[in-house]
């Protein structure tokens, strides 16, 4: 099985102020041998990182396999977004693209983000929706 680790996990895992129990909860997912990255996730994480954090994150990301984002996935992301709108949900654009990448590669998205639940309800997206520990 291929896991696609979403931005929400990477942000909490790499943020210095995240509590240790949260990082320990996330660690098995980001360290899983089947964990993969996708370019939209890389973009989301690195665009918000400070320069010194970005260098460390790039080094870590370079150790992970990256799922490709073929150009036709943009159209699939649009279709997913339209399907979500039909059920009354507006989903962030990059989440739609991450879902399209996961569907293309038959990967399971691992995320704290509930936008993926809406996408999974209108598609064949495989999702492991996590809840942050209290």
Predicted regions span which residues?
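Acidic, PIN/NYN-like endoribonuclease modules and their adjacent C-terminal/linker elements
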Residues: 1-2, 99, 103-134
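Generic structural signal for small/hydrophobic residues in well-ordered secondary structure
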Residues: 6-7, 45, 77, 102
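Active-site neighborhoods of divalent-metal-dependent phosphate/nucleic-acid chemistry enzymes
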Residues: 65-112
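Residues at the C-termini of beta-strands that transition into short coil/loop
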Residues: 39, 70, 131-133
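A general structural signal for well-ordered alpha-helical segments in protein cores
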Residues: 22-23, 42, 54-57, 74-77, ...
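General small-molecule cofactor/ligand-binding pocket signal
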Residues: 36, 67, 128
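Short, well-structured N-terminal submotif of metal-dependent ribonuclease cores
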Residues: 1-37, 46-59, 134
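A secondary-structure boundary/capping signal
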Residues: 6-7, 41, 112
